[in-house]
Amino acid sequence: VHHILSGVIAEGQTQKGMQNWGGGVGGYTVGMESTVAPKGIGSWIPSGGEFAYQMHYTPFGKEAVSAEQIGLYFYKDGEKPELIMREMPLVDQFITIPANDPAHKEIAYFNFPKDAILHTAVVHAHYRGTYSKLEILDPSGKRETILNVPFYDFNWQRMYEFAKPIDIKAGSKVIATYVYDNSKRNPANPDPNKEIVWGDQSFEEMFYTSLRYRWKDETVEKQPNYAQPLNKPPPTAMPADHPPH
């Protein structure tokens, strides 16, 4: 299994290949542990609808049976979380990694339209990914590194939970940086002589950061729709020599 994505959709709306859902209920990638929300916070699952799961398998030349299991943990009767955990991917599907480049850099970002609190981050690349960094650039110009993964390993992709959840001011940029080694010095590289672009299979590449956060002014009883301004425009790719400022 390469990865599993999940979501909640309206009944009968499931489509092959879809990955944009109204809410997430956890996921999996190689080396990742279970997803647990802090006390008083939960994933919002409206009544009706369906769970949707995107199952990504990498072919390895043999017939096999999928053996994944999914467990959902609910609050006890009479208990109700007041706050809602949201999920948002920062994705750049326009990456191009030159052949034989030992340290190719890609940068992308998006703007948070409202005040938020960031709880976790997952960085995801394939065999050529070697390094990843996540930064916050607030409206005053202050820039802070909140996650640094100096030795990315495809076989150990962790969900990084911040010891202290991070305040994100409205208008802040969340900036992701990835470095790829597409040279022969990378022992996991399937083909250093090939230019690499975005692709689902492990011998291709990805630039994918998953963030779990909550809106500061959102509660179960008060749910403003911030998804639309967050998704439009989509995350913006930037040339590595012209980072956002």
Which residue ranges define each predicted feature?
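Beta-strand-centric surfaces of beta-sandwich/beta-rich domains
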Residues: 1-117, 123-245
